[in-house]
Amino acid sequence: MTKPSRHFALTPDAIASLPEKDWQAFRPGVSLYPLHGQPPGAQSSALLRYQPGARVPSHTHLGVEHIFVVQGSQEDESGHYPAGTLLISPTGSSHQVASAEGCIVLAV
């Protein structure tokens, strides 16, 4: 007898076909698709979808944040990050995020 899997895979095709109704407004031009946990204060993960030109105002991280750029590109004061980039923002770090072309990122 095999044990049930405790994980799931989210392929690029699966991300592209996520139901529009399940995306939640997060910031103007940015929507959120919760994957695990309930922020704030809890361990959580979500997809963030930026429309072209969307910005998230300057903010300070209360904990470590990991961002993986899945599609498109994202930028902040420190650089430009194309698909495939992993960003790690330590506790207490601040930045303002934008996406000129639009993107989808995984935030943990």
Task: Annotate each PLM feature.
Residues 51-54, 61-76, 83:
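Glycine- and acidic-residue-biased ligand/ion/polar-headgroup-sensing regions
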Residues 43-45, 67, 102-104:
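Structural motif
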Residues 54-57, 75, 87-96:
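Histidine-centered metal-chelating micro-motifs
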Residues 36, 46-48, 57-61, 78-79, ...:
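Short histidine-centered beta-strand/loop micro-motifs
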Residues 91-108:
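Ligand-binding loop in jelly-roll beta-barrel domains
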Residues 32-34, 45-49, 66, 86-88, ...:
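Conserved hydrophobic/aromatic beta-strand scaffold that supports enzyme active sites
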Residues 1-42:
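A short, N-terminal "cap"/entry segment at the start of jelly-roll beta-barrel domains
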